[in-house]
Each structure stands twice: as structure tokens, then as C-alpha cells.
């Protein structure tokens, strides 16, 4: 059964992963975000309770 011989298939697997790992990461890392996140304030905003007139 030739499909059980790992010699050609293993090299194809290794070379395809080498191609993916050398081409795709630079393309993905080249993307820039449209807006950088700004650091949020550590102070909690002052919230006041509001009476709901239920009756």
C-alpha cells in the first residue's frame, strides 16, 4: 500500500507548513488597526441614584 509510505507525504507536509509559516505571518502582521485604543481612566464615574416614581 503506497499511501502508508510516509516518505513523499511527510516532505510535502513539511514544505507546505514552511511556506505557510514564512509567507502568511508577515502578511497578517502588516495590517494596522484604524484607531489605537486609548487608556481608560481608573476613576469610577460618579453615579447618582434616581428615584423612579412607581406609584
UniProtKB/Swiss-Prot annotation:
Query: Which Pfam families does the UniProt record give?
Result: ATP-synt_8
Membrane topology for this entry?
A: Single-pass membrane protein
UniProt keyword list? ATP synthesis, CF(0), Hydrogen ion transport, Ion transport, Membrane, Mitochondrion, Transmembrane, Transmembrane helix, Transport
Q: What is this protein called?
A: ATP synthase F(0) complex subunit 8
Q: For this UniProt entry, what is the primary localization, expressed as one broad class?
A: mitochondrion
Where exactly are the transmembrane stretches of this chain?
4-24
Q: Where is the composition biased (Polar residues)?
A: 38-55
GO cellular component terms, semicolon-separated: mitochondrial membrane; proton-transporting ATP synthase complex
Record flagged with keyword Mitochondrion: yes
Q: Which GO terms describe its molecular function?
A: proton transmembrane transporter activity
The alphabetized list of GO BP terms reads:
proton motive force-driven ATP synthesis
Amino acid at each position: 500500500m503506497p499511501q502508508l509510505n510516509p516518505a513523499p507525504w511527510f516532505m510535502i507536509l513539511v514544505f507546505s507548513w514552511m511556506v505557510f509559516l514564512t509567507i502568511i505571518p508577515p502578511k497578517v502582521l502588516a495590517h494596522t488597526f484604524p484607531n489605537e485604543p486609548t487608556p481608560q481612566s481608573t476613576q469610577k464615574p460618579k453615579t447618582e441614584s434616581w428615584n423612579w416614581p412607581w406609584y
